[in-house]
Amino acid sequence: NQDAAFERVYRRLYKVQYPLDRVGRQRLEKVRPTLQRYAEQIELDWLNLAALAFKESTLNPAARGAGGATGLMQVTPATARAMGVSNIHQLDNNVQASAKYLANIRRNFFASPRLNERERMAFILAAYNLGPQRVQSMRAEARRRGLNPDQWFFQVERIAMETVGMGVVAYVNSVNKYYLAYQRERYLLEADRKTAAN
C-alpha cells in the first residue's frame, strides 16, 4: 500500500536533531539579534528564520556548503546578487540576503489568500530549498492529479517525493520541527532580550 509506505517514511523523517542543546543555545544567542532584525523587516517570526538557519548550518556562520552556499543561511552568491546583497561571508549580509529571498519567494509565489500561514511557510521553505519555479510546477502537477495545490502536507509533498525524492520533504519537516522546539521555549529564548531592555 503506497499510503502505508508513505506514512512509514514520513514518520522516520520526523527524527531530527534537538536544536536547543547547550551548543545550540549558545550559537542561537550569538546570532539572535541579527535574525530578529531581518525577520522583523520582512514580517516573519524570527523563530522561523532561526529554525531555517539551524537546518542550513546548525547556526554556524562560518559554514560552507555545496555549490558555493555560504554562512549561517547557506546563501549562494547568485541568490545574494539577485537580492542586491554582497559579501555574504559577513553574518549580517548573509541573513539579509536570505531574508530578502524569503520575502521575494513569499511575495512573488505564495501570496495567495487561499494559503493558510502554516502551508504558506511550508511552500516557502520548499522553494528556498528547491527553487520557487520547481515548487510551482509541483503545485500544477498536484492540481492535474486532483490533489490540493494549496496544501503542502500530504498533497504537494507527495508530488515532491515522487519527482525529486524525500530530500525536500525531510527539509520542510525538519525546519518545522526546529521551529516547534524553538516556539515551545520562546519565553526563555526572548527573556534575555527583555531583561536587557529594562
Question: Model segments located where?
Answer:
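Catalytic glycan-binding domains that act on GlcNAc-containing polysaccharides
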Residues: Q2-N198
